[in-house]
Regions:
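Active-site cores that bind ATP or allylic diphosphates and position pyrophosphate for catalysis
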Residues: 1-124, 154, 179, 313, ...
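Short, solvent-exposed cationic patches
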Residues: 79-99, 133-146, 157, 238-241
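Generic recognition of stable, solvent-exposed alpha-helical segments in well-folded globular domains
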Residues: 79-83, 99, 149-153, 163-170, ...
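Generic, well-ordered alpha-helical scaffold segments in large soluble proteins
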Residues: 87-90, 161, 171-175, 194, ...
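Conserved phosphate-binding loops in nucleotide/dinucleotide-binding enzymes
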Residues: 48, 66-77, 105-170, 175-180, ...
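Active-site-proximal acidic segments at structured loop/helix or strand boundaries
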Residues: 179-238, 242-260
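Small-residue-rich helix-loop
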Residues: 225-330
Length: 330
């Protein structure tokens, strides 16, 4: 057969002759001992007909060349491990330690999160709400919001609307690992000090948009006022509400708005929800006649009179008490 193939001009490939009997036990730092039967392994091609090497040979040689001691990767690569260890043994390389991590699962499911299932995820109320909030911010910055390239499955989504890297990292850390039953917030330094592979969960954890937003809110509120201002300025600039470079009055005004807004600004992009404070009165455009008709109606006048009476009862006339008065009235 080989002679006939050569006569046809075919180029040979090189296959790895695998054992056909026995088992291989892999000590995995996350999953414990994992057993594979050699009979389930094929004789894999390790060099193509054009002379190039395939992934399994290349990655083993590459890891050895760079003195890799630990191979930490997603669980779908677990099935690749037997052939890679067989290659390492054949080449006389020391075996690295392996740790196969669980994937991030869909909301309310144990299936792997995938950008190809967006329409399914958008039926989840929290996922849909996060998508809508992101689109609202992106549209005001004149950015494309095509759901295939702008959605909560992609890291760029969070970067574009103002999520903090530390908040996203903190959330991802606790998706598959925990220190104890109470500690939630970790700085990067604390993560590096506390993290061990032994406490990584074997099972995948579902992506929870509400929990991620909760981490973002906590991290944003921890920031100094100066840092919050610095994060919000680019969003105002891209939306056309601030000059580039910004004028000297922007930072003090923005600081006051952030103080008054309190926890209503959870991500930097939320500052665009207060866009009316960055538009001059002359730039406001509205139809005067319909507005005058509505504002002079007896119902509106009565409401304003009753609201005025509530304000007269306020002892401390500051932003917090005024807001509480209006909210209670409404």
């Amino acid at each position: 057969a080989c002679v006939a193939f050569q006569a046809e001009g075919r180029q040979e490939v090189i296959r790895l002759k695998m054992p056909s009997e026995g088992t291989l036990v892999i000590p995995d730092l996350v999953r414990g001992e994992v057993t594979f039967a050699w009979a389930d392994e094929q004789d894999h091609v390790i060099r193509r007909a054009d002379g190039s090497c395939l992934y399994h040979l290349a990655t083993v040689v590459d890891d050895h060349a760079f003195r890799i001691s630990h191979v930490i990767r997603a669980e779908e690569h677990l099935s690749n491990t037997p052939r890679q260890l067989f290659i390492a043994d054949a080449l006389g390389y020391p075996r690295p330690e392996f740790a196969h991590l669980p994937f991030v699962a869909e909301p309310g499911s144990k299936n792997k999160l995938s950008k190809r299932k967006l329409q399914k995820y958008l039926k989840d109320p929290e996922f849909a709400r996060l998508q809508a909030e992101g689109e609202w911010i992106a549209e005001r910055m004149h950015r494309a919001t095509d759901v295939e390239t702008f959605n909560p499955v992609l890291v760029d989504f969070y970067q574009q609307i103002g999520f903090l890297p530390d908040a996203v990292l903190n959330y991802l850390l606790l998706l598959g690992w925990s220190l104890d039953d109470s500690t939630e917030l970790f700085t990067r330094e604390a993560m590096m000090e506390a993290f061990t592979l032994e406490r990584v969960n074997k099972a995948p954890a579902s992506f929870d948009p509400a929990k991620l937003q909760s981490f973002q809110e906590k991290w944003f509120q921890k920031l100094e006022e100066k840092k919050k201002v610095a994060l919000c300025v680019p969003f105002l600039q891209q939306a056309g509400f601030a000059a580039s470079p910004p004028d000297c009055n922007l930072a003090p005004r923005l600081n006051e708005i952030l103080r008054a807004a309190g926890d209503r600004v959870k991500i930097a992009g939320d500052i665009l929800r207060f866009e009316e404070f960055f538009v001059s009165d002359e730039a406001l455009d509205y139809e005067e006649k319909p507005f005058a008709k509505r504002i002079h109606s007896l119902e509106v006048i009565d409401r304003l009179r009753r609201l005025s009476e509530q304000f007269q009862k306020v002892d401390c006339f500051d932003a917090a008490h005024c807001e509480a008065t209006v909210r209670n009235f409404v």
